[in-house]
Amino acid sequence: MINEIRKDTEVRMEKCLEVFQNHISKIRTGRASPSILDGIQVEYYGTATPLRQLANIVVEDSRTLALTVFDRSLSAAVEKAIMTSDLGLNPSSAGTVIRVPLPALTEERRKDLIKVVRAEAEQGRVSIRNVRRDANEKVKALLKDKEISEDEDRRSQDDIQKLTDAFIKKVDAALAAKETELMDF
């Protein structure tokens, strides 16, 4: 029973870490990355469709993304979707290819993005701690029902705390890497 709780806790903490890493990967750093455009939806036959499903996105150089739209009739809709997104990008169409130049980040914008990343990291830590709390409550319930001894309870809580510390270290490492990436010129 305790092993099941531990495995479930580890899986849930891993998901919290994945969500955090996914969120910070979408924060623009000044370097071109196709993941920047992940959140963009394009109106396609009356349905909002992810841009990735409608175009091939490649990094042309460190500051430019190139999109090759599969259906040429969608080029205008793709450009409009990129322009109206909150990313502050201005695509330009050159025949079959849409180029998206990424403007350099100002110092002020970099600091704002670091604040956002730190807030995301704190949210990730809170999520991991909530998973720890849930796991500890399950262990306490087992102790209360006399299914485990107090020694097993203490050992389980120590294991859960070690897991929590390990995942919070991973969040902190990802945060430090993203901050470094944002401050690189």
UniProtKB/Swiss-Prot annotation:
It holds the Pfam family RRF. It comes from the Bacteria. It is found in: Cytoplasm. CDD domains: RRF (cd00520). Its main location: cytoplasm. GO terms for biological process: cytoplasmic translational termination. InterPro entries: Ribosome_recyc_fac, Ribosome_recyc_fac_dom, RRF_sf. GO terms for cellular component: cytosol. This is Ribosome-recycling factor. It comes from Yersinia enterocolitica serotype O:8 / biotype 1B (strain NCTC 13174 / 8081). The gene is frr.
